[in-house]
C-alpha cells in the first residue's frame, strides 16, 4: 500500500511539472487554433453554452495565416464548363498528332507488296534519266558459264605468295572522299559488286530495308565543279534488314535481294522494276525472315534460302512459291550458308547454335536427333564442327575445296572440304583474328573470291585483311572505320567494304588517274 502511494505521489508531481512546462511554452491554445484554421466550429459555442475561462492561463497570441498556395484543380471539380474552342481544341490537336505519328510508324514498317516500278520510290530523278543510267549494265552476255571458264584457267596449285601479294597491293578509291560515299542511310548489312568489268557498279542494303546503287566514276565527272557528288540512287524496298544481294547468273541486268521481312525480290535495271518473287511463310502464315540465299550451281533458276529460325528451302523461280519444301537445318538462326562449287548438292551452314555443319541435300532425315522440334524434316549431316561461340560465316574456295569459317571466338578456321569428310571436322589452319563485332557493327564474314583461292574479312581494327586458303596474309587494307561487310568483284581484283553509317570503301588494283 505504501509503495502504491509513493507511485501516485510521483505521478501527480510529474503531471504538475508537465502542466507548468506547457504554460511556459504557451501551447495550451494550439488545439483551438488548429480547429479555427481548419474551419471547424467549437461544439460548445455552437450549442450556445458559455465557455468558462480558466484562471491563470496566459492569453494565446494568434499569428496571421499564411497566404494560401494556389493548387491545380480540374474544371470538373470546380464545377466550371469546359472551353470547347480552347482546351478541347488543343486536346484534339494532340490526339491528331499522336494519330499521325502512329500512321507514320506503321507506314515505315509496312512491307512492300507486289511488283513495282522503282521510279515510284525515287522522287528526285526523272524516269528517263534513271533508265539511261542503268541500261549500260543490261549486258546479258555475262552468265555463269563465263565464270566457270575463268575457273578452268586456275585449276593448278596457287602461285607463290609473293606474286599474290603484288596482285593484292590494292589502292583506295580517291575520286570522292569516303565520307561522301553513303550508298545507303543506315548500317550496311549487304553488298554486291556487279560483274561488269567496263563500268563499276556496287549495290548495297542496310538495316532499314533501303537498297542503294553506286555508279562508280573512275574520275571526277565534272572537273570544273569539284563539289560534285557521287552518282548514288537509293530506294526503300523492304521493312527490315537487307540480308543478301546477288546478281542473276543468267542475266546480269537483274539483281536478287532478300530481307529479314521474308521478302525475296528482283530488281531489273533495264526496266527499273522490282518483282516480288517470294514472301517466305510457313504453313501457319507466319513470316520466315530470310537470313541468306544463293543461286544453285546446278540450276541457275533455283535459289537456296536459310532463315532466322533455322529453316532451309529451295525456290525454283519458274514455279509457284507454294511448291517449296521447307526443311530444318538448325534450331536457331542460320547466319550464313555456302554451296560447294565442286559438289552442288553439298551445303555448309553457320549457325547461332555454335556449329558449322555440312549437309547432303540428296538425303532426307524425317526426325533428326539433334533437333528439339518436330515441325520439319531435315537433310543428312555429313560433318560437324563445334565452336566455343556462335559461327558467323562460311565460304568455299572455288578451286582447292577449302572451307573457311569465322565466329565470335575471334578466330578464322580453314578446313579441307574434299571428299570423304569425317563426321567431326578439324581445322587445318587457325588464324587469330579480331572479328568479334558489337551491337552497332554488322557481323564480320569471311568471303572467298569467286575466281581465286583467296578470301577477305574485315578487321575490327578498321581494315580489310586478305589471306590465301592456307592462311597466309596477302594484304592489310586500312580504312577510317570498320568495313564490316565486304564483297569481291567476281573477275577483277576489286573489293568493297561497308560500315555502320552506310558508307563504303572501294579498293582497286590500279591507282585512280
From Swiss-Prot:
- Tell me the Gene Ontology biological-process terms attached to this UniProt entry: DNA damage response; regulation of DNA damage checkpoint
**Ranges occupied by WD repeats:** 183-224, 237-277, 329-369, 386-425, 438-477, 478-513
Mind listing the UniProt keywords for this protein, alphabetically? DNA damage, DNA-binding, Repeat, WD repeat
UniProt biased composition (Basic and acidic residues): 35-45
Pfam families (alphabetical): WD40
Q: What does this protein do?
A: DNA-binding protein that binds to both single- and double-stranded DNA. Binds preferentially to UV-damaged DNA. May be involved in DNA-metabolic processes.
Instruction: Identify this protein by name.
Output: DNA damage-binding protein CMR1
Native species: Eremothecium gossypii (strain ATCC 10895 / CBS 109.51 / FGSC 9923 / NRRL Y-1056)
Amino acid at each position: 500500500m505504501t509503495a502504491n502511494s509513493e507511485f501516485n505521489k510521483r505521478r501527480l508531481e510529474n503531471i504538475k511539472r508537465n502542466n507548468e512546462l506547457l504554460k511556459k511554452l504557451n501551447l495550451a491554445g494550439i488545439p483551438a487554433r488548429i480547429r479555427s484554421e481548419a474551419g471547424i466550429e467549437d461544439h460548445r459555442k455552437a450549442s450556445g453554452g458559455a465557455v468558462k475561462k480558466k484562471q491563470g492561463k496566459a492569453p494565446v497570441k494568434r499569428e496571421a495565416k499564411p497566404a494560401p498556395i494556389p493548387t491545380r484543380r480540374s474544371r470538373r471539380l470546380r464545377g466550371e464548363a469546359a472551353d470547347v474552342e480552347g482546351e478541347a481544341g488543343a486536346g484534339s490537336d494532340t490526339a491528331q498528332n499522336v494519330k499521325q505519328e502512329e500512321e507514320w510508324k506503321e507506314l515505315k514498317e509496312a512491307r512492300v507488296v507486289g511488283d513495282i516500278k522503282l521510279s515510284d520510290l525515287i522522287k528526285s530523278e526523272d524516269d528517263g534519266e534513271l533508265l539511261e543510267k542503268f541500261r549500260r549494265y543490261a549486258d546479258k552476255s555475262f552468265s555463269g558459264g563465263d565464270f566457270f571458264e575463268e575457273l578452268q584457267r586456275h585449276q593448278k596449285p596457287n602461285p607463290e605468295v609473293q606474286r599474290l601479294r603484288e596482285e593484292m597491293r590494292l589502292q583506295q578509291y580517291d575520286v570522292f572522299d569516303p565520307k561522301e560515299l553513303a550508298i545507303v542511310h543506315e548500317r550496311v548489312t549487304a553488298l554486291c559488286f556487279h560483274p561488269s568489268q567496263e563500268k563499276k557498279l556496287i549495290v548495297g542494303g542496310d538495316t532499314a530495308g533501303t537498297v542503294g546503287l553506286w555508279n562508280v566514276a573512275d574520275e571526277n565527272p565534272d572537273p570544273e565543279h569539284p563539289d560534285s557528288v557521287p552518282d548514288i540512287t537509293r530506294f526503300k524496298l523492304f521493312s527490315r534488314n537487307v540480308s543478301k544481294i546477288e546478281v542473276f547468273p543468267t542475266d546480269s541486268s537483274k539483281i536478287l535481294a532478300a530481307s529479314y521481312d521474308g521478302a525475296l525480290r528482283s530488281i531489273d535495271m533495264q526496266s527499273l522494276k522490282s518483282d516480288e518473287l517470294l514472301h517466305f511463310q510457313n504453313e501457319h502464315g507466319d513470316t520466315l525472315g530470310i537470313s541468306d540465299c544463293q543461286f544453285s550451281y546446278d540450276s541457275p533458276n533455283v535459289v537456296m534460302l536459310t532463315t532466322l529460325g533455322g529453316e532451309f528451302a529451295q525456290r525454283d523461280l519458274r514455279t509457284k512459291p507454294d511448291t517449296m519444301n521447307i526443311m530444318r537445318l538448325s534450331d536457331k538462326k542460320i547466319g550464313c550458308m555456302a554451296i560447294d562449287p565442286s559438289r552442288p548438292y553439298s551445303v555448309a551452314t553457320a549457325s547461332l547454335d555454335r556449329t558449322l555443319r555440312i549437309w547432303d541435300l540428296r538425303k532426307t532425315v524425317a526426325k533428326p536427333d539433334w533437333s528439339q522440334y518436330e515441325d520439319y524434316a531435315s537433310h543428312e549431316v555429313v560433318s560437324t564442327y563445334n565452336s566455343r561461340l556462335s559461327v558467323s560465316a562460311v565460304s568455299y574456295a572455288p578451286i582447292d575445296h577449302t572451307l573457311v569459317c569465322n565466329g565470335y571466338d575471334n578466330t578464322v578456321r580453314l578446313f579441307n572440304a574434299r571428299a570423304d569428310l569425317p563426321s567431326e571436322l578439324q581445322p587445318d589452319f587457325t588464324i587469330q583474328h579480331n572479328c568479334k563485332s558489337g551491337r552497332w557493327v554488322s557481323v564480320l564474314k569471311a568471303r572467298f573470291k569467286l575466281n581465286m583461292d583467296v578470301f577477305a574479312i574485315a578487321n575490327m581494327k578498321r581494315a580489310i585483311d586478305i589471306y590465301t586458303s592456307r592462311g597466309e596474309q596477302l594484304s592489310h587494307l586500312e580504312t577510317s572505320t570498320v568495313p564490316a561487310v565486304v564483297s569481291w568483284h567476281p573477275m577483277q581484283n576489286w573489293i568493297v567494304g561497308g560500315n555502320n553509317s552506310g558508307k563504303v570503301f572501294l579498293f582497286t588494283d590500279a591507282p585512280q588517274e
